[in-house]
């Protein structure tokens, strides 16, 4: 087993040794794990979930949540070959018609949701950390090139990747989306970003060892970085996005829900996906819309809030 796989094995053991947490946290972790790692099959209008779980610790964790929270006993179909880090893998079938709907994995027409269920997209606190932990356990890997170390989490769709990116950003960690031949993954580059994320989701025991391993292999990453045009552009974009988010937050405080629903929805969508571009934001909307349409709705929301603030004699969205 190479060093990267050893580091991944350490991380998985660390995460799986954590207490499962309260019901909301357990549900968030399970939902993300299934969204990022399971197949949903429709058989005679019944949703059957099949998921490959590697390692007996993960298998026991998932079975425990299914039994204790949802009263479901999944069926172990078969064992599959060991994965790259030597864990035994198991194919688990969950044949319960209500579970996918309870978790928000499907809509009313039995179609899989495009991104993440709404309750996960709005998650915070321990549920947010459970969401990210579940995604990492489902499809997270460590990678490295000549000069760069990264964690990558493979996503089933662009919309799902965008939602995970937003969730990671809520934990004050920079994540980006990369598309390779129609497949999407969320990438967290450099140990300086990866380590805080892993600590946030509970992997405190393994992070120090992973940091030491990376710094020994890539000492050139420890030196100061020279500023460049990309850094400057990123900073300008971040400042503009932060200003927009602050105005929208103030607008929602002023309006207190008294505004057209489609405008409120656009504002909340931006707050839930602070680092997404307008084009990406439009794709996340239900139904999807163009970047001009989503930008127009946000502008009208801000304009309406500023007019309301002037009428009430209170600070507007620029305050």
UniProtKB/Swiss-Prot annotation:
Coiled coil: none
UniProt keywords, alphabetically: Cell cycle, Cell division, DNA-binding
One Gene Ontology MF term: DNA binding
One record GO biological process: cell division
Family the entry assigns: Belongs to the WhiA family.
Function: Involved in cell division and chromosome segregation.
Matching PANTHER family: CELL DIVISION PROTEIN WHIA-RELATED
Protein name per Swiss-Prot or TrEMBL: Probable cell division protein WhiA
The gene coding this protein: whiA
């Amino acid at each position: 087993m190479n060093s990267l796989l050893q580091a991944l094995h350490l991380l998985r053991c660390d995460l799986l040794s954590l207490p499962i947490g309260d019901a909301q946290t357990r549900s968030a972790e399970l939902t993300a794990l299934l969204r990022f790692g399971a197949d949903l099959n429709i058989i005679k209008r019944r949703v059957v979930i099949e998921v490959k779980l590697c390692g007996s610790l993960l298998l026991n964790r998932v079975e425990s949540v299914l039994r204790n929270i949802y009263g479901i006993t999944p069926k172990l179909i078969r064992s599959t070959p060991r994965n790259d880090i030597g864990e035994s893998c198991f194919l688990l079938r969950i044949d319960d018609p209500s579970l996918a709907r309870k978790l928000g994995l499907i809509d009313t027409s039995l179609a899989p949701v495009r991104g993440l269920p709404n309750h996960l997209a709005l998650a915070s606190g321990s549920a947010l950390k459970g969401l990210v932990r579940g995604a990492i356990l489902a499809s997270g890997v460590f990678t490295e090139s000549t000069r760069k170390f990264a964690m990558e989490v493979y996503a089933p769709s662009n919309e799902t990747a965008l939602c995970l990116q937003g969730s990671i950003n809520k934990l004050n960690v920079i994540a980006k989306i990369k598309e390779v031949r129609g497949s999407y993954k969320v990438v967290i580059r450099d140990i300086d970003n990866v380590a805080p994320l892993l600590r946030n989701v509970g992997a405190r025991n393994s992070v120090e060892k992973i940091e030491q391993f990376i710094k020994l292999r890539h000492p050139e990453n420890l030196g100061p970085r020279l500023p460049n045009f990309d850094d400057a552009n990123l900073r300008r974009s971040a400042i503009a996005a932060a200003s927009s988010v602050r105005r929208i937050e103030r607008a929602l405080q002023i309006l207190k829900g008294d505004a057209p629903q489609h405008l409120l929805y656009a504002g909340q969508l931006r707050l839930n996906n602070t680092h997404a571009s307008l084009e990406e934001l439009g794709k996340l909307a239900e139904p999807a819309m163009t970047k001009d349409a989503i930008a127009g709705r946000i502008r009208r929301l801000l304009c309406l809030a500023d007019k309301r603030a002037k009428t009430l004699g209170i600070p507007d969205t620029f305050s």
